[in-house]
Amino acid sequence: MELLDKAVTDFQLFYQKILDLYESDFSPADKWTEIATHIHDNQQIPIGIYKLLRQNDTVNQIDIDYKSDLEQLNSKISLESDFIVKSSLIIASMHFIIYDMITREGNYSSIMYGSEEMNIPSVHNMIYYVYISTKNQQNIYFHAYILLFGLESIFNKKFYVGMDFEFTNKKIQLSQLNFEHNVSTKSIIMIVSPNELEDIMMNNFIKIIICNTNIKKILHGSDSLDIPYMYTHRLDGDPDKIIKFTRTLIDTRFLCEYYKLNSDIVSDNRCSIYDEDPSRSAVYFFKVISDEQQNKLAELLESMPAPHDIQWNIHKMPISQARYAAYDVLYLKVFYYRIIHVATEEDSSDIGKKNIIELYKHLLNEITRFVYLEQNGITLLMAKCKEEVDVVNNYFIRNSEGITKMIDIFNQVSLGLETSDPKVNVDSFSKVNHFKRPITTIIKRIVYGFISYRCRIYKDKSTIWTDKLDNQFIFDFLAKMKFNYLNKMFKELSKTLESRIVAICSVR
């Protein structure tokens, strides 16, 4: 209890200094510098509070008070005795102060208006403040802001961060991060150089943003450079950190590809998030941007070198390059929701729309996360499945129709597979190259598992294969990894597959 009391006292004193600086006679620029410096120099206090709050389930019952003004919040803080509630009030007050400071003219690099940049009425009141750390000493603003965002996420689990990275000769140069708040109409786009962040800044960024499962991270086409960079260089190949990061990762490229590949009116699956050619621009295809906005974007892109020729240097970025970098994350959250909205328009029934939302928000994201973990050797389910099926592909059964190889049984029983909860057509699912091999590998392993129990199998003309392949480890893995929708899908598929195999094999 003494430790808790000390933490509360320290946090309140920490906040009081922020309040004193905010109410001082300094200019807005000097206020923000002093506040950010104070937060940076005393980062152990908000980090300590973050750890304490994350360990307490009571936070799930409390909402941050975004409605009260600063005077009302300060009055509530002085009267409140409960540690959790008092902390939430202090965090609300910090939100009020920091969002006021960071959006004051002179304290940001540029500004983008939702009404000018996007064709979606729901974001026309949004303002995107772009901040670029052109000098190393300015990284304290990034540090102060992410500490606040991480603290807020303890009570507010509807945060998104749009993420992108820029590389020169495959070496990281920039991180662009669009911090999307579900209550505020102000979004903050931070552009920093990871190479120039102090260790404590990067460590806290990883801890309270990247590995924070309360915050969803949105990327687009991240498999070639972004994911390997994050897994290897930022998360140090640590499976625990990588799994936490990946658990709330969304890659909109694969949602876009799924939609296009399963649409009757689309002839290709090109999903560049934006492009000077309208036919290749995904945000234009899904009507996130208008004709006029597409033309403006095309003019910017035409003025730039080819993407692989761009030399990125955070200290020497022309306006066009800085705007290009901001666009990479500006659209991501809106684009994500727009894909889902467009997909739901193809079904008029409430249950149909619900099934589509479930597919896009959960199942497609889970399979994307699963594939990233498997491709990078963090989890090894596919490797185990492949190891067990490859050696028995040509083993066979005998029945009234003659000899049938196990691989042929798989090809026969895996046609036309569907599930009802979640509502999935496996053939549609497998049209996305990213998904095809993992889905096929797991289904094949399930099929061979049932064959091993239900059929008399021969290794050759005279040798019976007696091994039994239990499928339970697949479902145990999916449950452990919290791939709940994938788990339900494969369990339902397994029932269908078992019944089909029983019809083919002689039951012992």
UniProtKB/Swiss-Prot annotation:
It comes from the Viruses. One of its GO terms (molecular function) is nucleic acid binding. GO terms for cellular component: virion component. Keywords: Virion. It is found in: Virion. InterPro entries: RNaseH-like_sf, RNaseH_sf. This is Uncharacterized protein L533. The lineage of its organism: Viruses, Varidnaviria, Bamfordvirae, Nucleocytoviricota, Megaviricetes.
